[in-house]
């Protein structure tokens, strides 16, 4: 899965953002496990997943603050 685009994230509802973060956290767990066992081929995906989570959380906070 490629890095998520900001425009795609902004189009998500808050529930979709929560689901996306949960899925990315599961993916990060699996990637860490693969790295530990020496099975991870695409090491850059760990960085992408971490940054996708941060990107989603940042946009969610911006939306939440904009409502106030």
Curated annotation (Swiss-Prot):
Database matches in InterPro entries: Ribosomal_protein_uL29 (IPR050063), Ribosomal_uL29 (IPR001854), Ribosomal_uL29_CS (IPR018254), Ribosomal_uL29_sf (IPR036049)
GO CC, alphabetical: cytosolic large ribosomal subunit
GO biological process: translation
UniProt keyword list: Ribonucleoprotein, Ribosomal protein
GO terms, molecular function: structural constituent of ribosome
Record keyword Ribonucleoprotein present: yes
SUPFAM superfamilies registered for this protein in UniProt: Ribosomal protein L29 (L29p)
A Pfam family per the record: Ribosomal_L29
PANTHER family linked to this entry: 60S RIBOSOMAL PROTEIN L35/50S RIBOSOMAL PROTEIN L29 (PTHR10916), LARGE RIBOSOMAL SUBUNIT PROTEIN UL29C (PTHR10916:SF0)
Family matches, as HAMAP family: Ribosomal_uL29
Family affiliation: Belongs to the universal ribosomal protein uL29 family.
Identification of the protein by name: Large ribosomal subunit protein uL29
Organism for this UniProt entry: Nitrobacter hamburgensis (strain DSM 10229 / NCIMB 13809 / X14)
